């Protein structure tokens, strides 16, 4: 039986080896080393040959990393070498594209699972064979799966609350008059409780000095039971009457007597309406004056109460301080600078 060295000297073996080298897929020649920089290679055939050489090294080391007899340190070293070979392969593929060759990176797709999601660990640093079972790596894959599940749940909850109307978020509660009345009652009770607590703390026994609850919001809102069309008709009624009065002045002469009677009745109605308006305005003015007097008395009482609390201060301390003029301020700054120069040079 012939030895390997004798087989290597045969004519057929040398012919096949030279043929593979010429095609760019042959084995590495004796003493021939792969260039460290892919950009240093200017031949497309040589670049194809070195890429094939890297693929054979990757295949051999991926098969070797499956060995159960290897230790964890050897598995880590082999996995690092495989990732380094993948980086070199990418560099040679870029050089092949620059030299006008085929684009091998176009055929490399993204690995996905049954649900169409990208498999973790397919980008950047990869783990092969037994490297996926190393301590710390298995937890990394489990964590990425849990993170994807949490992101899908977060997206589902976002879609659930995405197309909800303003009623869902309580933006239409202010249109409910009953709810506003209830809130006003509770706010009034809370106001009165806090006022009593503050009065007991400050030692105020007179209830007339206590601040009253502000005007409720519900009193400013229109009544929901009244139809808005009815309100519009009431607003348009005086405009129609004015137009009718203007139109009566342009009637024919034969209806002059009837028009005079109608105008007389309308004038009487207008005078009565003016009287009622003046009466209501007088009443409103009297009520407003009474409210102003009450507010003035309340302010005076509050000022008296504040003066009682501030009895420890004299009148001069409560006055507004007198501000220095521009010249006085310049003199003060000049004195400060002189004092600083004296301290700097030791002159006292």
Curated annotation (Swiss-Prot):
Pfam families: Isy1. Residues 220-282 are annotated as: Disordered. The keyword Secreted does not apply. Keywords: Cytoplasm, mRNA processing, mRNA splicing, Nucleus, Spliceosome. The keyword Cytoplasm applies. GO terms for cellular component: catalytic step 2 spliceosome; cytoplasm; post-mRNA release spliceosomal complex; post-spliceosomal complex; Prp19 complex. SUPFAM superfamilies: ISY1 domain-like. It is found in: Cytoplasm; Nucleus. Residues 264-278 have a biased composition (Basic and acidic residues). GO terms for biological process: generation of catalytic spliceosome for second transesterification step; mRNA 3'-splice site recognition. Coiled coil: none annotated. Associated with the spliceosome. Belongs to the ISY1 family. Involved in pre-mRNA splicing. This is Pre-mRNA-splicing factor ISY1. The lineage of its organism: Eukaryota, Fungi, Dikarya, Basidiomycota, Agaricomycotina. The gene is ISY1.
């Amino acid at each position: 039986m012939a030895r390997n060295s004798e087989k290597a000297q045969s004519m057929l073996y040398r012919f096949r080896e030279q043929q593979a080298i010429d095609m760019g897929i042959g084995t590495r020649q004796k003493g021939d080393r792969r260039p460290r920089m892919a950009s240093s290679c200017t031949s497309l055939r040589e670049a194809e040959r070195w890429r094939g050489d890297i693929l054979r090294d990757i295949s051999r080391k991926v098969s070797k990393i499956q060995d159960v007899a290897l230790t964890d340190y050897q598995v880590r070293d082999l996995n690092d070498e495989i990732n380094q070979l993948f980086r070199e392969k990418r560099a040679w593929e870029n050089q092949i594209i620059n030299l006008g060759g085929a684009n091998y990176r176009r055929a490399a797709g993204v690995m996905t699972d049954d649900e169409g999601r990208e498999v973790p660990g397919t980008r950047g640093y990869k783990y092969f064979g037994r490297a996926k079972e190393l301590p710390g790596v298995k937890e990394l894959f489990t964590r990425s799966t849990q993170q994807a599940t949490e992101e899908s749940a977060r997206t589902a909850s976002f879609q659930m609350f995405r197309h909800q109307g303003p009623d869902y978020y309580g933006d239409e509660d202010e249109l409910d008059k009953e709810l506003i009345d209830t809130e006003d009652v509770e706010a009034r009770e809370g106001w009165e409780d806090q006022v009593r607590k503050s009065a007991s703390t400050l030692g105020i026994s007179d209830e007339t000095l206590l601040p009253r609850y502000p005007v409720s919001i519900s009193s400013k809102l229109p009544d929901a039971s009244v139809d808005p069309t009815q309100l519009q008709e009431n607003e348009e009624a005086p405009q129609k009457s004015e137009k009718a009065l203007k139109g009566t002045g342009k009637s024919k002469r034969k209806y002059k007597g009837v028009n005079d009677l109608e105008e007389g009745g309308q004038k009487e109605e207008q005078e009565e309406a003016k009287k009622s308006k003046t009466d209501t305005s007088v009443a409103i003015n009297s009520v407003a004056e009474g409210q102003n007097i009450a507010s003035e008395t309340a302010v005076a009482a509050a000022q008296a109460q504040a003066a009682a609390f501030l009895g420890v201060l004299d009148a001069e301390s409560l006055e507004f301080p007198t501000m220095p003029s521009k010249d006085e301020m310049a003199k003060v700054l000049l004195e400060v600078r002189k004092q600083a120069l004296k301290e700097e040079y030791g002159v006292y």
